[in-house]
Regions:
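Bacterial N-terminal signal peptides that target proteins for export
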Residues: 5-18
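Bacterial N-terminal signal peptides
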Residues: 17-28
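Boundary at the C-terminal end of the N-terminal hydrophobic targeting segment
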Residues: 29-33
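Conserved alpha-helical scaffold segments that buttress catalytic/binding sites
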Residues: 35-333
Length: 333
């Protein structure tokens, strides 16, 4: 009886050994056929290939991080925005050449597009002017390669050196809770005054400001916006009249640059920012806005700014911003 049981156990052991061996042999093929889990590998935006040498750049989209928050008047932490955006972009990471599939509409967008992450600009804390020169130089190189720049901030002061790199006529579409036309820094560049400088750039022909709200926009900032001739559409007006109120304010343009401050969104949706205001635009409102902007002209660049992960451990601010970015690009390309 013991011999029979021993023989059966031996046969079972042999079968298990064979099965394990087959699994081991199959693992390389299985692994090669699968997308790696999101927790595997070096973090790049959407797991795009990493290409830090801008002289070798050859892509449709180049993602550039600007980890700078020396221009903020609110809670610092935006310097970690690029890292947070890259981390939370892993939720959407896959083979980017396959594009993005929308189940609503049963459609695939941005298929065949080549993305690269070119890393971060080397910033110099407490030396904003030198940092600004580095930002402008990097964006100029991207543009020279006929590649679309996607800039990850950073506080909103980085938008000035980014736009300074362009030499084509631009309409700047500024989505924000704040006008950013305040001159309280006595002429110095910061995240609340960058519009004053952008308006003086030769390439900038029109500035449209969308989503402003709350009690942090003082009469001086409002007066400066009027003096500059910017077109302002508040969040209240968008709530009341619909997204068409914002789209109608954007003129037909040869080229459009979008700067997206995440504090334009309702803080219940996007708490991860340094200077949020109660209220704000809903996801549906901003998403429709993003989808409609390219109907007014050629999209030539964009930035996502004021992401502060210290105020949003959940990461939903960054993930929402990424989704809105994809929807904007899908509408444009």
């Amino acid at each position: 009886m013991e011999r029979v049981e021993a023989g059966g156990a031996m046969r079972n052991l042999t079968a298990v050994t064979v099965l394990v061996g087959l699994i081991i042999l199959a693992l390389p093929a299985f692994a090669g056929a699968q997308t790696a889990p999101t927790f595997v590998g070096v973090r790049t935006f959407l797991s795009a290939p990493y290409e830090p040498d801008l002289d070798k750049l050859h892509a449709d989209f180049a993602v550039l991080g600007v980890p700078f928050d020396e221009g903020t008047w609110g809670q610092p932490g935006e310097r970690y925005g690029p890292r947070d955006l890259r981390e939370n972009s892993q939720e959407y990471a896959h083979d980017l050449t396959e594009g993005f599939y929308y189940i609503d509409g049963d459609r695939t967008v941005l298929k065949g597009k080549h993305w690269v992450d070119v890393g971060d600009v080397i910033v110099y804390p407490t030396v904003p002017a030198e940092t600004g020169e580095k930002i402008t130089a990097a964006v100029k190189k991207i543009l020279a390669k006929k590649t679309f720049p996607i800039i990850l901030g950073g506080d909103h002061s980085i938008t000035f050196p980014v736009i300074r790199a362009f030499d084509v006529p631009l309409t700047v579409v500024h989505i924000d809770a704040h006008l950013d036309t305040w001159n309280g820094a006595k002429g110095n560049l910061d995240h609340a005054s960058w519009v004053l400088r952008v308006a003086k750039l030769p390439a900038v022909k029109k500035i449209v400001q969308l989503g402003m709200r709350g009690i942090a926009n003082d009469p001086e900032a409002a007066g400066n916006a009027k003096a500059l001739g910017t077109k302002v559409v508040t969040s209240e007006e968008i709530h009341r009249r619909g997204v068409s109120a914002a789209i109608d304010a954007i003129p037909r343009s040869e080229n459009i640059y979008v700067t997206f401050d995440v504090d334009s969104m309702d803080p219940a949706l996007a708490p991860g920012t340094g200077t949020y205001e109660p209220g704000g635009l809903s996801f549906a409102e901003i998403d429709e806005l993003m989808k409609q902007i390219p109907t007014k002209g050629k999209l030539v660049g964009l930035d996502i700014v004021e992401v502060n992960p210290y105020r949003d451990p959940s990461g939903r601010t960054a993930q929402t911003a990424i989704r809105l970015m994809v929807d904007l690009l899908a509408a444009a390309f």
